[in-house]
């Protein structure tokens, strides 16, 4: 009996050790309360949610902001996802091509058809017309997917919660509808990965997200053992690091004009103004808008209102999504987001199926090809040179106050009349953000690391401006001389 007790005790000890070792070997999610300091990318972490799951073990191969992240992800996965790499040819204002007002793959990514204008249909309560929501609802209703990963607005009617992003694994239309409207702060889309992997009833999935989250998702999607995966992306630039920062941006920029109002979202629009959509908080209230010219914003708003990860991003156009929805390439033909066109980019056969499903379900209207006019390059470099973020990098003059409102309105009117429009406005926005972000990564990590982390298409744009624009070249040289 004594010998038997020893055997039992020994077996128990071995079993306990095995469990302890197994627990120790299992990747441990990072506590989100320590963000960003305890996360691998530190200040440049985009809070995509990957590290908040057991998939954290894949972070060095998936994160868009570690090592050569965006170059590794976009250049390395584009052909795998879409069947081919993009045509790298870029369109410039001086080119003689007759189609220089049509979106090219060099900037906008792989396309199976030209970028088109689109509106959502039969989607109430959207920030725009419901293009993204309409596609997602159609796919779920038709049985094309079993679930949708999206970011819900943690909105209980309280005006303080309007910008709080909450990732959900939506299995019903009502749950998908919680994802309506843009969330202006970093959102951990991938935080539901463990729930997804444990859900044996989900075999076909739609993942909705911005570029950095889509990149990380594409890097690990093979681990999920799903039969079909669809990815619906949005264009994205300059998110706030937290909901509090987004609210601070509005309160500081618009003073008391939004007091007591329920904000439904805001966008930096093609008329060089920030448009804030709001209502009075009642169930039947209709949306109204408050607008402020970019030029009248206080100079220090970028310091707290733009996440550091967004300053190191080169995936404005969401290169690895099957379908991408945005608005910068659309004409500003309405004073209301509720009736304005957006753009839709279809990248592959999966994307064609997604769009066709939404059209057949009468939740999507696709119109003519997106087009544009006007020169964009000089607008990009002039914007860059006057940017407080850039001036801080080069030790230049920092503006603390924006223009007086009337002068700002005049400037916005002139810029809208004289500046690039449609697709060419999108080119302006893409180039400006790529150039600014190149200067940022050059300043933080140096020339060699910067060149290694920037995807090929962005590097081509940077090289073009370095070769042709003396002002941009001078900014880059000033930053290089600091090291």
Predicted segment positions?
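Iron-sulfur cluster-binding cysteine motifs and their immediate structural context
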Residues: 27-44, 49-89, 323
């Amino acid at each position: 009996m004594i010998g038997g007790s020893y055997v039992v005790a020994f077996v128990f000890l071995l079993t306990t050790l095995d469990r302890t070792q197994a627990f120790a070997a299992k990747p441990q999610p990072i506590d989100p309360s320590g963000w960003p300091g305890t996360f691998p990318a530190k200040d440049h972490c985009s809070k995509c949610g990957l590290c908040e799951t057991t998939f954290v073990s894949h972070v060095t191969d998936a994160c868009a902001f570690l090592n050569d992240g965006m170059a590794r992800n976009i250049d390395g996965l584009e052909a795998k996802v879409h069947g081919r790499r993009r045509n790298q040819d870029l369109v410039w204002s001086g080119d003689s091509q007759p189609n220089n007002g049509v979106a090219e793959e060099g900037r906008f990514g792989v396309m199976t058809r030209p970028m088109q204008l689109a509106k959502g249909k039969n989607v109430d309560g959207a920030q725009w017309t419901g293009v993204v929501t309409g596609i997602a609802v159609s796919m779920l209703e038709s049985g094309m997917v079993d679930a949708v990963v999206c970011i819900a607005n943690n909105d209980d009617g309280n005006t303080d919660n309007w910008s709080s992003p909450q990732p959900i694994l939506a299995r019903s239309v009502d749950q998908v509808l919680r994802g309506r409207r843009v969330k202006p702060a970093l959102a951990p889309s991938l935080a539901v990965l463990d729930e997804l992997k444990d859900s044996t009833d989900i075999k076909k999935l739609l993942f909705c997200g911005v570029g950095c989250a889509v990149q990380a998702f594409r890097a690990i999607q093979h681990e999920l053992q799903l039969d079909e995966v669809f990815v619906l992306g949005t264009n994205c630039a300059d998110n706030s690091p937290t909901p509090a920062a987004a609210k601070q941006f509005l309160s500081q920029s618009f003073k008391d004009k939004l007091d007591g109002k329920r904000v439904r979202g805001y966008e930096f629009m093609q008329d060089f103004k920030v448009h804030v959509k709001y209502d009075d908080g009642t169930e039947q209230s209709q949306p109204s808008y408050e607008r402020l010219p970019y030029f009248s914003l206080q100079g220090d708003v970028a310091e707290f209102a733009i996440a550091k990860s967004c300053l190191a991003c080169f995936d404005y156009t969401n290169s690895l999504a099957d379908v991408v929805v945005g608005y910068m390439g659309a004409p500003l033909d309405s004073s209301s987001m509720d009736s304005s066109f957006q753009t839709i980019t279809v990248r592959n056969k999966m994307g064609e199926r997604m769009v066709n499903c939404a059209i057949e379900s009468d939740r999507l209207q696709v119109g003519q090809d997106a087009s544009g006019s006007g020169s964009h390059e000089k607008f990009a470099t002039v914007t860059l040179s006057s940017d407080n973020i850039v001036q801080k990098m080069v030790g230049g003059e920092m503006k603390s106050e924006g223009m007086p409102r009337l002068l700002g309105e005049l400037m916005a009117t002139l810029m809208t009349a004289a500046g690039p429009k449609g697709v060419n406005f999108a080119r302006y926005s893409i180039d400006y953000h790529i150039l600014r972000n190149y200067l940022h990564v050059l300043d933080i990590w140096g020339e060699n690391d910067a060149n290694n982390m920037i995807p090929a298409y962005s590097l081509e744009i940077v090289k073009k401006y370095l070769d042709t624009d003396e002002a941009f070249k001078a900014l880059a040289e000033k930053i290089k001389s600091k090291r």
